[in-house]
Amino acid sequence: MNWIKVASARELKNDEAKTVSVEGHGVALFRIDDEFFATDSMCTHATALLSEGYVEDGCVECPLHQGRFDIRTGRAMCAPVTVDLRTHAVKQEGDDIYVMSPAAK
């Protein structure tokens, strides 16, 4: 497995997100209840960065059309989104946050 360091834990507070690059792939990194999760960075419905969306109750709302995704599973929760997000494995070692390379899947 190819793990890529993308951030330090202190960079994100709970219910915050940021876009990171993992070997040229845009990935949205989320912190929920002191756990880290990663999905593809773009909404599956339209060209919008999910890291700019509203994060609440383990879901992210697309900033463009308000479609919602479950951050933990990538599941599309409501219209207009119908296609699930791809999720990425995340691990934390001390303060360092790693995401598995999308190419490693």
For each of these PLM feature ranges, what is it?
Residues N2-S8:
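Short amphipathic
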Residues E11-K105:
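Rieske [2Fe-2S] iron-sulfur-binding domain
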